[in-house]
A protein has these predicted regions:
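Peripheral, non-transmembrane regulatory/ligand-interaction domains of membrane transport proteins
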Residues: 1-104
Length: 104
């Protein structure tokens, strides 16, 4: 699913469609057609959008043309039903910066 947000004054408002300067937030369930729409319209490499879906992805920074990818690992509560003693696990989060948009 795609959500679009833009700052107006000191508040962030949800938009109905993509506009220049907006934040694009991509959440499950992922639709291949929506991802392709973003890559084509913004010129983002598809792997920039999909790399953070890999639970084993490492934190890193990449630059391709004028598009930046930042992958960070953030802790979340381990909700696994196994008897694993680890209270927290880390999951990757991708942040893509283009000249006109932020994509998460």
């Amino acid at each position: 699913m795609l959500y679009f947000f833009q700052q107006q004054g000191d508040k962030i408002h949800r938009l109905e469609k993509m506009e220049s300067g907006c934040w694009i937030h991509v959440t499950p369930p992922f639709n291949e057609a929506e991802l392709e729409k973003i890559t084509e319209r913004l010129g983002i490499p598809m792997d920039f959008l999909t790399d953070s879906l890999d639970i084993d992805e490492r934190a890193r920074y990449e630059l391709e043309d004028d598009i930046k990818l930042i992958v960070i690992n953030t802790p979340i509560l381990n909700e696994s039903v196994t008897s694993e003693p680890t209270l927290y696990i880390t999951v990757p989060i991708g942040v893509i910066l283009t000249p006109d948009h932020v994509v998460t």
